[in-house]
Amino acid sequence: MKLRVPLLLLSLAGVCGAWMAIQTGYARSGAATSVSNHVGARASSSGLPRPSPAETGAHWIWQNPLPQGNTLYGVSFTDANTGTATGDNGTIIRTTDGGNSWAIQSSGTANTLYGVSFTDVNHGTAVGAFGAIVRTTDGGNTWSSQTSGTTNGLLAVSFTDANTGTAVGENGAIVRTTNGGNTWVSQTSGTPNNLTAVSFTDANNGTAVSWDGIILRTTDGGANWVSQTSGTDNILYGVWFTDANNGTAVGFGGTIVRTTNGGANWVSQASGTKSSLYGVSFSDPNNGTAVGGDGIIVRTTNGGTTWITQTSGTTSTFIGVSFTDANAGTAVGASGIILRTTDGGTNWVSKSTAVTTESLEDVSFTDANTGTAVGDDGTILRTTNGGSTWVNQTSGTINTLLGVSFIDANNGTAVGVLGTILRTTDGGNSWVPQVSGTVDDLWGVSFTDANNGTAVGFDFNTVTGLILRTTDGGSSWISQSNGAFSPLVGVSFTDANIGTVVGGAGIILRTTDGGNNWVPQISGTESDLLRVSFTDANNGTAVGQSGTILRTTDGGSHWVLQQSGTTELLAGVSFTDADHGIAVGALGTIVRTTDGGSTWVNETSGTSYDLSRVSLSTAVGYGGAILRRELVLRPTPTPRPVPTPRPRPTPPR
C-alpha cells in the first residue's frame, strides 16, 4: 500500500488544490469597468525530432482541453469583444473577437494569477500567489512584473483608471497604487482574514469582502477601511458595485446580499440555489449575473429582487464572470472552461472544448501521429494526426484504466483496476474484455508483438507483486511467480523474452526468458519507482518518488542514480533511443535529456496539474490534460540579392 498513495496523489493533488483554493477564499472581485473573480512506454523508432541548425527550442502546447486546461479564476472584458482571463500557473489568455478564439500570452510568472482588471483594451493588471503582480500597457503583448511589497497571496484586484488600483488578499492584505503599479503601498484592513474580493467604482469608493460575512468599505481610497454589517456569517467570495451606492456580494451556499446605500445597509436576497457563488458582475444597477459551483448561473434584471437560474449545460465550477452590458458576458472556471452569452444568459455557448475532463493515466504512441490515451472511468482516447484531434472510443467499462500498450496502429491492450484487461485489433474501433484471472489492480502493461505481453500490479490486501503473462494475444493470461513483496507498477519489454519490472520501495525485477524467472536487481534506492523505459536490451531508465531517476546501460546489472533537477514525483518516462528521453510528474514537472541522462533539463509545461505518463512527445494527466512538445524554428533568413557587377570600362590605350 506504500505506493498506492503517491500514485493516487497524481489524480487528487490537482482537485484538492482547487478545492482548498475555493474553501480558503480564492475567489474574488469586481469594479465598475472591470472584474476579477477567483477561487482558489513503448519506444518508437521514429524518435523525438533532433535539433537542427534552424531549431531554437521547443515548447509544450495544449491539445486538451482547448484553448488550455488550467483553471481560470479571473476574467475582465472592456467591451463585447476584448477580454482577458487569468488562472493557474501564471496563465493569461486573451480574446479580441468575443471569445471565439483565445491566444495564450506569456505572463512571465508561474504563480497562479487569481485576479485581473482592465480599464481599457491596453491597460491591465493581474495579481496572484505570493504577492505576484504583472502589468500590461499593450493589451497583453508584453507583461511586466511589479513589486507588490507583500508575499501574501493577492486574490483580487480592481482598477478604476489606468493608474489607480487596489489589490486584496491573504491575511487581510491590501495594497494600493496611484501610478499604474510603479509603486504599491500597503494599507491597513483591520482584519487577519483573507480578503477574497474587491470592487472600486472610482478612486475613492471601494468595498472588499472576506470570511465570516466581513465587508470592509472605504470612501477615501483606502486610507481608512470601515467594517460594515452584512447580515451573514457565510464566506463572501465575490463583490460588484456599479456606482458608489449600488452593490452586490455573493458567497457560500448561494448567499447574496445587496446594498443601495453604499453598504450602510445590506439586505439578504434569495438566490434560489444552495451552491456556493464565487463570482458576480453587474452591467448596471438592475442587470447582474452570479456564477458558482455545480455549473450554477443565476441572473437578475431587477437589482436582485428576483434571481433566475439559467442553463449552463455543465456541472463544472465557474469562478469568474464579466459582463460589459446587459447582454454580453463571459464566465470562466475549472479546467479552463469558458462560456459566453450575447443575450443576457438566455443562451450560454461554450468557447472552450474538451474531449474529456477525466484524468488520463497512461498514453502509448507507435509513431508521431498514432496514439491512444486511457484513464478514469474507462476513458479511451485516440488520435491519428499527432493529437490535432482526439476522439473518444467505447471501452465498455467504467473501471479506471491505468496502463496501455500498442505495438502498431491496430493492436493494443489496456489494463486497469479490478483486473480489467481490454484488447483491440482494429485501432480501438472495438475493445474486447479479456479474462485476467484476478480482481487486483493492474498498473502497467507492455507488449512487444501481437502475441507476447506482460501486465503488472499488486494484491491490495497482501501488497505483494503481481505479474501476468500472455503468449497468445491475451486469450489466456497466466500468473508468474516473482517473489515481490512490494507493489509492481511499471513494466518494459524490448522483445518477447527480455523485460524489466519496477515498483514500490525501489524494487526492480529482470527476466531474460519471458518471465519464467524473475531476478531481483540492486536499484540502490528505497524510493517507489513508477515507470521504466528500455529502448534495447541494455539501455533503460526508471523514474519515481522524489525526482528519482535511475539509469542502466548493461541491462540492469548496474543502476546509476542520475540528477533529475527536481524533487517532485516523476510518474512517467519515455525514451526513443539510448540518448533522448522525457520524464513527467507531479505539478506539471517535465525534464528532458539528449545525452542518456547525463544531464536532465527542466522544460516549462505550462501547467501545474499532475502529469501521469508520457509517450514520445505527448504527456497526459489530471483533468484530461494532453500536452504535446513542438519545436520552435528560427525563421529562415531571406537571402540578400547579389548585385550584378557592372563591367569595368576598358581604359583607353
Description of each model-found segment:
Residues 19-637:
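Residue-level hotspots at or immediately adjacent to binding/recognition sites across diverse folds
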Residues 643-652:
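Short, low-complexity, Pro/Ser/Thr/Gly-rich segments in the mature regions of secreted, periplasmic
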Residues 1-5:
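Positively charged n-region of N-terminal signal peptides that target proteins for export
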Residues 9-18:
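Bacterial N-terminal signal peptides
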